[in-house]
Amino acid sequence: MLVSAKEMLEKARAGKYAVGQFNINNLEWTKSILLTAQELNSPVILGVSEGAGKYMTGFKTVAAMVSAMIDELNITVPVALHLDHGTYEGCYKCIKAGFSSIMFDGSHYPIEENIDKTKELVKIAHAMGLSLEAEVGSIGGEEDGVVGMGECADPNECKAIADLGIDFLAAGIGNIHGKYPANWQGLNFEVLENVKKAVGDMPLVLHGGTGIPADMIKKAISLGVAKINVNTECQLSFAAATRKYVEEGKDLQGKGFDPRKLLAPGAEAIKATVKEKNGTVWLRWQSLKIKQISQNKLVQYKILFLKNHFSNFKRNGLF
């Protein structure tokens, strides 16, 4: 059963460790990450970008696939299904589709508009039992074709967003999506310290976890980071393993062209990457019970949600 990411991240923040968000792109990605999390007895957050959601034919398909896979694989560790860098409209669609957590990325809006939209989504997400992540200070690099220069967040703006009742906050501190260039200056810990002072005990999120040195990761955790996102590293390991399989001609041996065999090395490479991350301090897991959302409670949430927010759904073309 899917759970909100709120409790797992609050416990990570208090325990000074971090939970990993690994983005999924298809069935192989999802299966590999879930099986590895179960093997390691570790909670996990499955991130889904809007581009990946579209690739998998829509958020409803993603939610159904993940929920069914959790059941069929007998996954018992806490799993959150989380929209990554969601638009205002995308957040509504994921709420309706059955996600258990959403991220609204309003960092490209003027702060006043970011506050207004975040405030509305907080009320709706919480009415449905979902956790909500917000962002201040755009993350650099490329995400689904959108290239951001990256900037450091304003601690005062972080406090304004945090005070809206969000569950965790992504603050730009010099981190970027994708591969880090050779001239990257590293994480800005002065900004992170000031953000921590401004938002108190709120769990912080570090996007662009691929390629950040372990010592920086550990320091970031000591300053309040409780969720670290990884996507590019899994993609690179999948591509390298698949390339090796083809270059060695294994796809031409027997029925090596069968997709179940062709994609297997890449799937195993994803497992190895997730294990590697879970083996570091930043993904240390303590065996804690995470509250799950019961079906009866979900029905109650949905009734309340429809009563209070029908006009918002109608306005966004979701009814």
Language-model features: where?
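Alpha/beta enzyme core
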Residues: 5-9, 27-51, 59-76, 88-200, ...
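Short, conserved beta-strand segments within well-ordered enzyme catalytic domains
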Residues: 21-23, 43-47, 80-82
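N-terminal amphipathic alpha-helix/helix-capping segment at the start of soluble metabolic enzymes
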Residues: 1-20, 67
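C-terminal alpha-helical cap/extension of soluble enzyme domains
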Residues: 213-293
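Short hydrophobic targeting helices and cationic amphipathic motifs
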Residues: 304-313, 318
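Low-complexity, intrinsically disordered or signal/transmembrane-proximal segments
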Residues: 292-295, 300-301, 309
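Glycine-rich beta-strand-to-loop/alpha-helix junction loops that act as flexible
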Residues: 135, 206-210, 230
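Glycine-rich beta-to-alpha transition loops that act as phosphate-gripper elements at the mouths
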Residues: 24, 81-87, 203-214
